[in-house]
Amino acid sequence: MSHLLIQASTPLCLLQDAGRFGVRHLGVTQGGAADWLSMAWANWLLGNAPDAAVIEVTLGGLSVVAKADCTLALAGADLAATIDGQPLKPWRSFALKQGQTLAFTLPLSGARAYLAAPAGFVAPQVLGSCSTVAREQLGGPDGFGRGLVAGDELTYTGHAGQLRELSYELQPVFSANPALDVVLGAQMGAFSGQSTFDAFNSAWTLDTRADRMGIRLLGPALVYQGAPMISEGIPLGAIQVPPDGQPIVLLNDRQTIGGYPRLGALTPLALARLAQCLPGEGVHMRPITQDGAQREHVAFMQRLKSPSPRGRGD
């Protein structure tokens, strides 16, 4: 069993996996990695299951020390990672020798990086997951929902093989003003015609009021003209429109029910793109059919099963 010592951390450095399923009828949210795609690639680089437990590093501020020679993998945002001061780019596995320090400083591209270990980090399973949800006091290194703090030791039991790097053409690009695909919801027809036009033809800015529960989008006020709603279950990526007309995209740590009307829901791949956007950046929404969203998702999952890695001898 190998160990990593947390030397420094922030409240935004969390243990995550795919999240909790089959428990929302109990009022327990899903949790899980905000950018599931980058988590899956980080795990793939080590031959792990796609949902093996990883460290989600948001905006930087994490440093870890290897207690023994090890092989780890990094995917997602470029948070200016270094090993003993030497730059380390994402989308690759790498060796970390005993006593060396891996540090994440500040976002150069994207917002969230994912650090994987062979077979995944070991942590208590709470309702089938180790994902950290602070509000519900679930998951994390001790099972009670806290983030990583200095002095924590994380363990893993797997063994890595050859160092690998994800082919450039498969690496997600965290571009400016990304397109977010939306599967339209049941209340879409109850918005005004102007609001329907504005939703998909306007630039939206990410508000600073953003966390793992949701992200508010700033732009033209959308007007709902339908009858008041009874609260209902909320899927991951739902786009709620409160009375002020500014949409809120609900994320992994969202509440389980809500009564605001919804434009629809982001596709899983759109959610991964949104998770890498910073407050103040722009996005735009575009409608997609459920059929089209499913085809896009299946195509990605096929690439995940049989990508073209580059072996590395360094």
Where are these regions (language model features)?
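Conserved "landmark" site that anchors the functional core of diverse proteins
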Residues: 1-310
